[in-house]
């Protein structure tokens, strides 16, 4: 049985971008209808309950300075923030040696260099800093609206980040630290990503240190009640009649005087058809490319989706009765070249109970460990925690993980990235409407691309595009 519905604008995807676009359209007096494949809203933002009314964020979670759009939206919805726990000494495990320090790795204070010297030489830290400064200078030359128009766009887009790092660093340790940072920000390896994409993304986020930093950086704060509160509240405001869950869009007919979206109906054998004046596709480019379009999309747009793979990440939470590491003067933050969780944060609730160690498996290690049994992954992650924080870390009360590449309607995280040649050959198609079809999603943002703030920007932009177009129509 096929249910038939009509709307002014059909929106594919109930993540932040799709819900913000719907909100903008509703404010303009239009009737949007959001179709979401999952049985929930939020997309790559997801809370998991851990008891006592508390949650951990198994998807996107942080907000930092300069992310004005998501900050304003959260404030309007009444969602407050609290600081990521950053007090105490951070741990770094490198080449089989361990050091503790306070501050950021890119800080050049003498006391930090001294503290780190057991694991990382002063020469390697200086090497890292000179390359980071050069990278930031290059990034500022990349136009955020048109990365392909950068002065050396083709040269930069024709090489991987790995190639650039090898040419611009002198120490193996600095190269390894750039690898760790690439995994942490893009959930990919330096060999996977175009240098131009790294530069665009760095400029988009306000500099390399801001991307990787906690205090003063992109990981500075979290949301009370978890980040998924924001899309949940947006969906509540939108109203159930404007949102359909369990409705993956399979085919979009577009052209003439409207669009027709064909989706599953939520029950076995059921189908849903939505007729609208225009459509916004607010899912990652990889997933947008899996929808069938009639007529087919222009070659440039279709091939773009073939050249924007998603990163790979497994997000783990080891949950303890209390954050015992704090009593030992540790922040809970750690970086390790051994892994498998190479980046660790204290992800405890704001009152510090229970204690939560968040461990990320990213890039190559996420691909390797994602193919292994869950029990084996858990054992390896906890062994790494114990190596860093002591044997007590090997015995959590509960262990939670999310393998985002296994999610049918996600297939990876944190977001899509550009491979070599992607920006200069296909980038013009990323945001450009195709007739009655418009594109949204964090990857299409020009500021804080790939982040929740970028998702909000993209939803506002796509909603405004369509509202203006329908005024003319």
Q: Which residue stretches match the model-derived regions?
A:
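FAD-dinucleotide binding site
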Residues: 1-473
């Amino acid at each position: 049985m096929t249910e038939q519905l009509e709307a002014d604008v059909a929106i594919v995807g109930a993540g932040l971008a799709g819900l913000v676009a719907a909100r903008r359209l509703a404010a303009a007096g239009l009737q949007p209808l959001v179709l979401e494949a999952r049985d929930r809203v939020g997309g790559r933002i997801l809370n998991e309950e851990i008891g006592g009314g508390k949650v951990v964020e198994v998807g996107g979670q942080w907000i930092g300075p300069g992310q004005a759009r998501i900050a304003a939206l959260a404030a309007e919805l009444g969602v407050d923030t609290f600081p990521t726990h950053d007090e105490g000494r951070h741990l770094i495990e490198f080449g089989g040696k361990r050091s503790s320090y306070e501050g950021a790795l890119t800080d050049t204070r003498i006391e930090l260099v001294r503290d780190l010297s057991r694991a990382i030489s002063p020469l390697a830290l200086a090497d890292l800093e000179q390359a980071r400064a050069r990278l930031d200078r290059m990034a500022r030359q990349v136009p955020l609206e048109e990365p392909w128009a950068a002065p050396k766009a083709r040269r930069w887009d024709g090489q991987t980040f790995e190639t650039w790092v090898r040419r611009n660093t002198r120490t193996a340790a600095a190269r390894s630290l750039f690898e760790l940072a690439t995994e942490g920000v893009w959930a990919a390896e330096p060999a996977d990503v175009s240098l131009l994409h790294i530069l665009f993304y760095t400029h988009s986020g306000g500099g390399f240190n801001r991307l990787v930093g906690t205090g003063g950086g992109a990981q500075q704060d979290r949301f009370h009640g978890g980040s998924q509160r924001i899309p949940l509240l947006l969906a509540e405001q939108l109203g159930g009649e404007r949102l359909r869950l369990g409705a993956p869009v399979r085919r979009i007919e577009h052209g003439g005087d409207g669009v027709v979206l064909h989706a599953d109906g939520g029950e076995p054998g059921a189908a849903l058809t939505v007729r609208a004046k225009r459509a916004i596709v607010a899912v990652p480019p990889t997933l947008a490319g899996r929808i069938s379009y009639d007529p087919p999309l222009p070659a440039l747009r279709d091939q773009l989706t073939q050249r924007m793979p998603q990163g790979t990440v497994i997000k783990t939470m080891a949950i303890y009765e209390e954050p015992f590491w704090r009593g030992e003067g540790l922040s809970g933050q750690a970086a390790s070249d051994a892994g498998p969780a190479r980046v660790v944060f204290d992800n405890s609730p704001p009152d510090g109970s229970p204690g939560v160690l968040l461990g990320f498996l990213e890039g190559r290690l996420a691909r390797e460990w994602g193919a292994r049994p869950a029990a084996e992954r858990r054992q390896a992650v906890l062994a790494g925690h114990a190596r860093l924080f002591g044997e007590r870390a090997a015995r959590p009360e509960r262990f939670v993980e999310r393998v985002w590449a296994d999610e049918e309607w996600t297939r990876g995280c944190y977001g899509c990235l550009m491979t070599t040649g992607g920006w200069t050959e296909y980038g013009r198609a990323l945001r450009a409407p195709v007739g009655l079809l418009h594109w949204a999603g964090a990857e299409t943002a020009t500021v804080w691309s790939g982040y929740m703030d970028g998702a909000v920007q993209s939803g506002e932009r796509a909603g405004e595009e369509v509202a203006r177009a329908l005024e003319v129509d």
